[in-house]
Amino acid sequence: MIFCKINIWYNSLRDTQIYSYVICVLLCKLRTEKWNVKFYQREDTIMDANMKKRNELLAKTVIKGLESRNMSGYYAQDKEAALKQALELIPNGSTIAMGGCMSAHEIGLVKALQDGDYNYIDRAKLEPREGLMAAYDADFFLSSANAVTDDGVLVNIDGNSNRVSCIAQGPKKVIFIVGINKVCPDLDSAMKRARNVAATANAQRFDIKTPCKETGKCFNCKSPDTICCQFLITRYSRHTDRIHVILVNDTIGY
């Protein structure tokens, strides 16, 4: 009888020990996984903070270059800040025209102008020539840059050339909305970006027949439908306070 009680007690203790061991293993595994999640989340947060800081420093470098070229530069930490900065530059009642600027749409600027106290020229409702003439006489012209060098040179490529012509002359002021993704180390890489990234992406928007539309790669073509007709390199603005560039710490536009 005593032996049986001891045996039952021993088996019960053994089961309890096994149960406790299993619980400890599970808790350790859970804690490890939880710590790993926290570690990776912390790592991602650090990486995001590092990239944000890098982009901010890069933007300051670009802005310094723009200012040396008689152009004004602004840093926006996100799309909302970019929208606020753009609206601060445009007084109520202003006449605004625009080329094909996806970045202005992405930050909500086009909708804000359409809904606000502004005279927004919708070129889609006008004949091409009429829209171009209206843009030349506008108070503000909205655009993005296909690329910008880190020392402040703006690079744009165009098909019909209405956009690059308005950047060069005509509208009283030009506001560029430029994602930090478009900053390049030099003019050569900026021109390559305009051809190989911006133009090949923009080609997808149009009903055209070009090699880049079919393959996504630039072939330096002379197709009748090519949208790479005119390069505009803006290295200096003769007119003070005409060109304003808002650099957005985000990947926007083509």
Region spans (language model):
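Low-complexity, intrinsically disordered or signal/transmembrane-proximal segments
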Residues: 10, 17-21, 40-41
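Acidic/polar hotspots within intrinsically disordered regions
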Residues: 21-24, 36
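N-terminal active-site beta-alpha-beta segment that forms phosphate/nucleotide-binding
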Residues: 55-142
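Conserved phosphate- and dinucleotide-binding cores of soluble alpha/beta proteins
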Residues: 136-254
